[in-house]
Structure formats: C-alpha cells, structure tokens
Amino acid sequence: MNSIQLIIDIILILWILILTVLYFKRRQLNVDIVKNKKIIRAKRYIVFYVISEYKVKGDDLERVIRNSLKDLLGSVWLNIANPKVVTYREDTQEGIISTNRVGYKAVLASLPFAKEINNNKILIVPRRTTGSLKKAKKLIGLK
C-alpha cells in the first residue's frame, strides 16, 4: 500500500513540475511579444482629397477629422489613432493624414462622417494608404 502511494505521489509531483515549467515558458513568451513596440509606433499615411464648393483650410480639416473619429469610436480610439494632417495643399485640396498602424482603419472608417466645415458641406475621399511619407508626398505631387 505504501509503495503504491509513493508512486502516485511521485507522479503527481512530476505532473505539477511539468505544468509549472510550461506555465513559466508561456508567460515568458507573452512578455516578449508585449515588449515589441514597433507594431504600435509604425506610421501609416492616408492620402486623400476633399470635394467641396469652397476652399478648406488644413487646421479646420484636422479638427473635423478628429471630431468625426471621436464621434464614431470615442476618445479612446482618438488617442490610439492620433490622426494629424501632415500636409495639405489648398490649391488642389489634397493632403496627407498621419496615423499609426493600429488606428489607420479607424481613421478610414471615420472619414465619411466628416461632413461639414463652417457650414459648408464637404466629402473627404481617401485615395491610398502608404507606409512612407515620401511615397505619400509623391502621390499628391510634392517633391
């Protein structure tokens, strides 16, 4: 009877040891994934143009884009995406919005909700999303 109990105890101890080792390996793996901040910092640039009867200023455009994102998904996604109008050409009404890799789809989804600037109706149409500012500037005809 004692020998059977001893064997069961040894098997249980080995089982607990194996589970503990697997748990710590998994925990260590998750920590390595979280430390990778490149995913969050990677930039995306959205090239867009504005359809409007009147000329639109870049500052007003950024304010409207930020408000539409806040109305659609809330202030948490506004802080995550942090959209900024990097370049805006008032003559052709084309521009570039800078955001990060996590929030660029949220910014794209909120662009149709930006409908009005200073009681003038507008429509913001995204043309392309790129990973480099140089390529985005080339698409709107700068440099």
UniProtKB/Swiss-Prot annotation:
One of its GO terms (cellular component) is cytoplasm. GO terms for biological process: tRNA 5'-leader removal. Its EC number is 3.1.26.5. InterPro entries: Pop5/Rpp14/Rnp2-like, Rnp2-like_sf. It comes from the Archaea. It catalyses: Endonucleolytic cleavage of RNA, removing 5'-extranucleotides from tRNA precursor. It is found in: Cytoplasm. It is an enzyme of class 3 (hydrolase). This is Ribonuclease P protein component 2. The gene is rnp2.
